[in-house]
Amino acid sequence: NKYCNIKCSKVAHTVCQTGESTKPSSKNCAKVSITSVGVTEEEKKLIVDEHNRFRQKVAQGLETRGNPGPQPAASDMNNLVWNDELAYIAQVWASQCQFFVHDKCRNTAQYQVGQNIAYSASTAAYPGVVKLIVLWENEVKDFNYNTGITKENFAKVGHYTQVVWAKTKEVGCGSIKYIEKGMKSHYLVCNYGPAGNVLGAQIYEIK
């Protein structure tokens, strides 16, 4: 497939490694009971709207949390749009059931691609996509804009910084919902183009 021509520092592309199917991996997914694969049209809209709502909140200087807060306003925040190719690659990876592991090569011909992963489970109902994105947003509480992202703080704030990375233009996500130990579980993989979280770069320009 065409993704076998896209290389990332000597690692084969996810879609080259796994094949082009978005069906759950029979080997890895056997340990859970999968109930749905993929994002609905409604979920796509919710994902884009929630990213842009939060990006605008930060851009307008309305995010009071931080270490220290508030976060400075931004002058260069792009509005995100959905990208089906990013979503497809994210879905191929989500369907591998390699929970909480980032794939090594997810780029497209157009973009270096970043990634956020989230998981939540409940006995009552499957947690929605907005709830999962809010988990990423909440990392702002540990973020110091002046320090930016470093190897030291990346694990604590890296999801937040990708959500609000100003130069990112497009997002696409894959999802699987499954039952594990009686819990209704939702696993979300979002891919971003162009990628954020470039060490040493500013997450956005201050207004």
From Swiss-Prot:
On the 2D-gel the determined pI of this protein is: 9.7, its MW is: 26.5 kDa. Residues 49-192 form the SCP domain. Keywords: Allergen, Disulfide bond, Glycation, Glycoprotein, Phosphoprotein, Secreted. Belongs to the CRISP family. Venom allergen 5-like subfamily. Disulfide bonds join 4-16, 8-105, 29-97, 173-190. Pfam families: CAP. It is found in: Secreted. This is Venom allergen 5. Glycosylated. One of its GO terms (cellular component) is extracellular region. Expressed by the venom gland. Coiled coil: none annotated. It comes from the Eukaryota.
